[in-house]
């Protein structure tokens, strides 16, 4: 190939690569926007916020568990990018999913593997208050990607956390 032909092929390759990169960026931004909107909708929900602020929920508040679980199960919160949504309540030391209730140590093990190190990682995760952040953890060759939103979304000590486990292939 002549120099001009190689240059033309290279220019075409660069144009195609740039177009593909733009499409990927748009898709990623749209996906993260949906995930963030779902998390903020949960964080701003009055039922969830009120429950998170109770110092020690009573047995009568257990009905609220089912209400909150149904909110987690709504279609907007189960997009293809999100594998699972956990709603961790500091006051209970428990996390809810659409179907299950986890103790704090069991949740740490599910997210980060068994052992004391997983509890330490979970404690670090819940010590930072944030509107929406994406964090990754790698352990034993497996990478966990989490979108984390605090309730309340500002302040030094969150009373609850929304943890969205993201599909690394998505």
Q: Which ranges hold each PLM region?
A:
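N-terminal membrane-insertion alpha helix
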Residues: 1-22
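A general structural-boundary detector
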Residues: 4, 8, 25-26, 72, ...
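Short hydrophobic/aromatic-rich motifs at helix boundaries and adjacent loops
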Residues: 7-12, 41-45, 145
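Short alpha-helical interface patches
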Residues: 5, 50-53, 170
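Conserved beta-strands of PAS-like sensory domains
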Residues: 100, 108-115, 140-170
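PAS and PAS-like sensory modules
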Residues: 129-138
């Amino acid at each position: 190939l002549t120099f001009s032909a190689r240059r033309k092929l290279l220019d075409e390759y660069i144009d195609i690569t740039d177009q593909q990169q733009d499409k990927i960026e748009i898709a990623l931004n749209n996906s993260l926007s949906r995930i963030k909107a779902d998390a903020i909708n949960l964080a701003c929900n009055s039922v969830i916020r009120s429950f998170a602020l109770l110092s020690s929920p009573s047995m009568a508040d257990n009905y609220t568990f089912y209400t909150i679980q149904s909110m987690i199960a709504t279609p907007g919160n189960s997009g293809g990018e999100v594998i699972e949504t956990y709603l961790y309540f500091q006051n209970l030391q428990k996390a809810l999913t659409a179907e299950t209730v986890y103790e704090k140590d069991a949740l740490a093990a599910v997210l980060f593997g068994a052992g004391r190190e997983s509890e330490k990682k979970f404690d670090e995760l819940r010590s930072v208050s944030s509107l929406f952040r994406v964090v990754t953890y790698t352990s034993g060759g497996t990478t966990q990607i989490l979108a984390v939103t605090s309730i309340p979304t500002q302040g030094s000590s969150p009373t609850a956390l929304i943890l969205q486990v993201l599909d690394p292939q998505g």
